[in-house]
């Protein structure tokens, strides 16, 4: 009981992070497998679609899970996401044409997105304050382990000369989904969700189980009372907890923007671009085929080891300072990486330097942004809107941003056209000048009046 139970719950629920890492990582190696390329013969644009469509499903999974998590509870919402992961993995492994593969990726993405929203909220709500950073950070550790295993699985299967080369790795996506589904039966429900639904006795029992030893029972009861009073106060302040209400209340709106901002800044570090197209990066540096897949495996292993070590310190660190220092360090790393990639004449030393910069970038990320982003985004929302708020914030962590980047630019372009660009259709070139307040321009009506006046004067002179 106590800390061992909290850690067990964090690790079991963290299998969702393993799913996220494995599902993302396995496609990195799959799109480089010879048998996969022979089966689907994808063009470069289709490769991008195969990679990104999972995150499109994840976007909708995040938004759906917020409501379901409030209605059903955190445990049932986790099980809900697992069903989609298992079905999606089966569809991908059995795919014989691109459409079936895309549907499988979309379904899997929906499940992973649902879990990405639900699990960090659950982990934050069951964790004593002192250990919250470590427990929620388990999500990133499991993600790193999943990514590493995906890379090594892809490397091992690359030696097989049949469709097993890519079907087996894709089929394995379903295994952690099944484990998490049945493991969820043994997880205690979130005490904050229980209090929210007036199950006070059950909530107190869970809180007492989650505290380290009997000497802390008084502290457990004190925290229980704090949870009850906080939720009671939140209910009194606002009975409505819709998504729209989050935007209406200033304090909630600020939390949402901060939570979404964390994920947006994480993605703008460039980590997902590097992870998804890792083998292509290595190929551009001269490490092709199986060598690129092997380096991907080493890359994933380094990330898992770094994250594991970081969890021993994350609960002792502040949140902001490590993130800011990481951004500065990653900026320098990316500049060097870009220079080495561009300077192809540097030869083998330049190639090795480029690989080293990729690894250094990943080490910095895994020790800072990796675990701390999950922690910060999950702990800033009040219980009353934690699921809905985090679901909207975590949706930013899905790769729909690659599309919504263009959604944003198109929408902004529409506004610019509406308010700044004058309409020119049906106007003469001279009349168009008037639209820009050109005082040197003579309006057509003025020209016509002058012409009429000159004609009239000419006629009168003749008479």
From Swiss-Prot:
Q: Give the main location.
A: membrane
Q: Where are the transmembrane segments?
A: 5-27, 46-66, 83-103, 106-126, 141-161, 168-188, 256-276, 293-313, 323-343, 355-375, 402-422
- Its domain of life reads Eukaryota
Its annotated compartments are: Membrane
Name the InterPro entries for this protein. MFS_dom, MFS_sugar_transport-like, MFS_Sugar_Transporters, MFS_trans_sf, Sugar/inositol_transpt, Sugar_transporter_CS
> Which UniProt keywords are given for this protein, alphabetically ordered?
Membrane, Transmembrane, Transmembrane helix, Transport
UniProt topology in membrane? Multi-pass membrane protein
Q: Name one GO molecular function term.
A: carbohydrate:proton symporter activity
Please give the GO cellular component terms listed in this UniProt entry. membrane
Which PROSITE patterns does the entry link to?
Answer: MFS, SUGAR_TRANSPORT_1, SUGAR_TRANSPORT_2
Give the PANTHER family listed for this entry. PLASTIDIC GLUCOSE TRANSPORTER 4 (PTHR48022), SUGAR TRANSPORTER, PUTATIVE (AFU_ORTHOLOGUE AFUA_3G12170)-RELATED (PTHR48022:SF80)
Q: Family per UniProt?
A: Belongs to the major facilitator superfamily. Sugar transporter (TC 2.A.1.1) family.
Q: What does this protein do?
A: MFS-type transporter; part of the gene cluster that mediates the biosynthesis of echinulin family alkaloid.
| UniProt-recorded name of the protein | MFS-type transporter criB
